[in-house]
C-alpha cells in the first residue's frame, strides 16, 4: 500500500485479491483505495453540523456535488451556499414533534361529572339503561317532587284519624260479635252445653221399656238353649 498525500493507493491486482494492505507494487498503475461500505453522500461540512450542533438536513447534501441544480433555476436560488463561504441554510435546528392535545383527561372527567350531576333521577335511569327505552320513562319524576319524611316532632295526635283502618270495619259492622269480656263461668257452661248436645242421642222409648225388652230377649235366649 502506497500513501501519497494522506491518500492510500494500491495496484488493481492487489485490490481485487483483497491484498491492498500488503501491496508494494509501484511499477504499475495505482488506484485509490476506497473505504469499505457504501460511499457517503454527505460532505464533511454537513456531517460536522449534524454531529456537533444537532442539525438535521432538509434533504440530500448538495454541497460540492455533481447533482447541483442548474444556475438560475428556482432550486439554485434556494440552495445552500455554505461551500461558497455563505452561512449554511440547508440545515435547521431539530424541533420536538410533540403535539398539544385538545384537552386533558382531568378536564374531560370534570365535564362528565358535571353533566351527570345536572341530570334528574329519570335521566340517570335512561343513561344507565335501567328502565329500557327513553319513551317508556316518565321524565316528570324528579328528586325535588318527592316529599321529605316526617320528623318525630312533626307527628300530631290528630293524624291518627287519617290512618287507613279498613281492616277493622268488618268487626265494627258485625252485631253478633261482642267486644265485652266473657267470664270463666259462662265459658264453662257453654262448654258443657256443647258437650251434652253432641253426646246425647234421642231414643223413642224410656228406660223402663228398655229393661222390659231386655228381660224378654234374655228369657227367649235361655229357652232356645
From Swiss-Prot:
Instruction: List this protein's GO terms for biological process.
Output: intracellular copper ion homeostasis; intracellular iron ion homeostasis; positive regulation of transcription by RNA polymerase II; regulation of transcription by RNA polymerase II; response to copper ion; stress response to copper ion
PROSITE patterns, A to Z: COPPER_FIST_1, COPPER_FIST_2
Give the chief site where it resides: nucleus
Q: Where in the cell is it found?
A: Nucleus
Q: Which domain of life is it from?
A: Eukaryota
Gene Ontology CC terms:
nucleus
Listed transmembrane segments: none
This protein is called what? Transcriptional activator protein CUP2
Origin species: Saccharomyces cerevisiae (strain ATCC 204508 / S288c)
Give the taxonomic lineage as stored in the record. Answer: Eukaryota, Fungi, Dikarya, Ascomycota, Saccharomycotina
